[in-house]
Design a protein with these regions (language model features):
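Interfaces that engage single-stranded nucleic acids at replication/repair/recombination sites
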Residues: 1-20, 24-26, 35, 45, ...
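Glycine-rich anion-binding surface patch
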Residues: 22, 70, 122-123, 145, ...
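Phosphate-binding/switch region of NTP-binding enzymes
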Residues: 21, 127, 131-215
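Generic structural signal for beta-strand residues in well-ordered domains
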Residues: 9-11, 39, 133
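Structural motif
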Residues: 17, 91-93, 141-142
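Conserved inter-motif catalytic segment of the P-loop NTP-binding fold
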Residues: 21, 40-131
Length: 246
């Protein structure tokens, strides 16, 4: 039976995507965001599909790592997220979800018969993975690789080719599933391409530090007695040290 009720704001769990080309600092930036949200490295887990890259930043703190071991099927990702949830992780970093889409494209390419009809064997698996992310009781940060191209920029009177990120390597429209999508470039500058929190859209580019994660957590925990704490709008949040490449 249908009913109508007043709108209410419940405590939210952020579903955030960080997208950029190789070397833009996605893993490192995700860890800084996660620490800003928890202030406790032991409550952070990284689901690693990047051949051990999650361990490169162990000097930051003792966070947890789940290696996918070369199995990038949606079912293995789902199992890894469930493992982290059962272990009481507050923030789960899925690094990256592009490998899952690559796996599904390869799976589809190997199917016999009508190519269009064969998507019926792929889409439910992708949808189950997306729903696992959206319905998780933990904060989820997903990284996505972007396709790369080169543009010519002028430096000291000369045209120099620079690598730029284009479309994310995931299913079309995947960005619609997230509350926030942050685009990060090779200089580790970040801008929001989607933002339902009101924290980032229309603001200058910035560099991620834990203070960004703190601002996101404040938004998630908003109740009628609280007000949103807007993050700083200068180029950096707190510590201006840029993220290393990852």
């Amino acid at each position: 039976m249908l009913n109508i009720r007043p709108s209410t704001r419940k405590q939210a769990k952020i579903k955030l995507a960080l997208q950029g080309c190789a070397g833009s600092g996605k893993t490192y930036s995700a860890l800084l965001l996660a620490y800003g949200m928890t202030s406790d490295w032991s409550k952070i887990a990284v689901i690693d599909s990047e051949n051990g890259s999650a361990d490169l930043y162990a000097h930051l703190g003792t966070y947890n790592v789940v290696s996918l071991g070369g199995d990038y099927s949606p079912e293995n990702y789902i199992e890894a997220i469930t493992l982290c949830e059962n272990a009481g992780m507050e923030v789960i970093i899925v690094d990256s979800i592009s490998q899952c889409w690559d796996y599904l494209l390869d799976f589809h390419a190997g199917l016999q018969g009508n190519s269009f009809a064969n998507w019926a064997k792929v889409t439910p698996r992708q949808n189950a993975f997306v729903q696992k992310i959206l319905q998780s009781p933990a904060h989820i940060i997903c990284t996505m690789r972007t396709k790369q191209d080169y543009v010519l920029n002028e430096k000291n009177g000369k045209l120099v080719p620079e690598k730029v990120g284009l479309k994310a390597m995931q299913r079309d429209g995947m960005d619609y599933e997230f509350t926030v999508v942050l685009d990060i470039d090779l200089k580790h500058h970040v801008q929001a391409s989607k933002d339902r929190t009101g924290l980032f859209m229309g603001r200058p580019e910035f560099t991620i530090t834990p203070k960004v994660g703190q601002a996101i957590l404040n938004w998630c925990n908003l109740n009628p007695q609280q007000t949103i704490v807007q993050p700083q709008t200068s180029q950096t949040y707190g510590n201006s040290t840029p993220a290393p490449s990852c």
